[in-house]
Amino acid sequence: MSGLVPIVVEQTNRGERAYDIYSRLLKDRIIFIGGPIDDHIANLVIAQFLFLEAEDPEKDIHLYINSPGGVVTAGLAIYDTMQYIKPAVSTICLGQAASMGSFLLAAGAPGKRYALPMARIMIHQPLGGVQGQATDIDIHAKEILRMKDLLNDRLAHHTGQPLEQITRDTERDYFMSAEEAKKYGLIDEVMPYRK
């Protein structure tokens, strides 16, 4: 059942047109990350960013995030694209933005980072594991520490928190409510319900 993607039908002056729900949202410049972030998801998100920039480089793009996180390099590819393209990228957390999901949430355009009231946000240090020869393990250990420093530096930049605070807080899983994430600087506003 999880593989089913709803189809929506739109009436136009030329007749009916059917879209899968994600294509319909893309028409409104909405991109959705709804699960773990891996290379496949990153490539899809990046392609959508580049397409929307080509369509209209002046109009905001809205990135909705409900993700437990994922592969650091895949998330950094999305991050780099968000920073590279001309349109402002607003980020909206619904459900959860954990690990790389919270990193992308914080990387939205200043003043345009949101979470719904019941959202949960979690930051922590990158996870990794490797096996093999001692030299290879040492190489990978140095790389994950370099990634940890890079992610902490970027989080400090986007949140306004001192690097020392970020380093302390990411030593272990650090969960926040939407309001706590706002105070921390991960988001700018908690979005009220529309009704």
Swiss-Prot record:
InterPro entries: ClpP (IPR001907), ClpP/crotonase-like_dom_sf (IPR029045), ClpP/TepA (IPR023562), ClpP_His_AS (IPR033135), ClpP_Ser_AS (IPR018215). Signal peptide: none annotated. NCBIfam families: clpP, PRK00277.1, PRK12553.1. Its main location: cytoplasm. This is ATP-dependent Clp protease proteolytic subunit. Cleaves peptides in various proteins in a process that requires ATP hydrolysis. Has a chymotrypsin-like activity. Plays a major role in the degradation of misfolded proteins. One of its GO terms (cellular component) is endopeptidase Clp complex. GO terms for biological process: protein quality control for misfolded or incompletely synthesized proteins. Its EC number is 3.4.21.92.
